[in-house]
Amino acid sequence: MADFSIITVTYNSENTLKRAMESVINQTYAPKEYFIIDGGSKDNTVDIALSYKAIAEKNGIMLSVLSEHDNGIYDAMNKGISMCGGDIIGMINSDDYYETDALKLVNESYEKDHFDVLYGDLRMCYEDGRSFIKKARNRKYMTSRDWNHPTMFVRREIYKDNKYKTETIHDDYDLVLRLKKQGAKFSVLNK
């Protein structure tokens, strides 16, 4: 069974953070640790994050909150990655949420496939209640439409040598392409 480290990068996220955090803390397969990496929010984001510390600990999750200036989302992600001790690292944006059994399904896939990188389908929800499923695909020649960043889980050893670049808004896609080129084992969870 794998230990999970989950990272949420925030900046002025007081309106969306609660749902994201609750979706992590209430997993049927709890993560080992959960990091909130905040870019120096001016609203109540940090207070909201800290208010979940006791609940997280009750569920066996070590919650850490770091708030300081960063150089954008990928810099913040790299900070979080450097703090992680779990076998598998997941990133969930402050305006996204996991289904209750997400980590259980990822762990089952890891036990079966021993992936380096896993990603899955993504339910896109609109404020008016409409939603659709963006299917994930694993092809030899990937496009940015084949994978869904909020559903991506990566073995910590892979991230150690492959940080996000912090130069453009497409640095997540750059990372996926670099990992593909290096021969990382990709797996898709279509659920």
Model-derived segments and spans:
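Glycine-rich, basic loop-to-helix element that forms the pyrophosphate-binding segment
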Residues: 66-84
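N-proximal low-complexity "stem/linker" segments adjacent to membrane-targeting elements
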Residues: 1-26
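Short aromatic/hydrophobic "clamp" motif used to bind/position activated sugar donors
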Residues: 89
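Conserved donor NDP-sugar-binding/catalytic core segment of glycosyltransferases
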Residues: 97, 101-132
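Conserved nucleotide-sugar donor-binding catalytic segment
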Residues: 137-191
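A conserved acidic beta->alpha catalytic loop
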Residues: 30, 38-48, 93-96
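Short beta-strand/loop segment that forms part of the nucleotide-sugar
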Residues: 32-40, 64-68
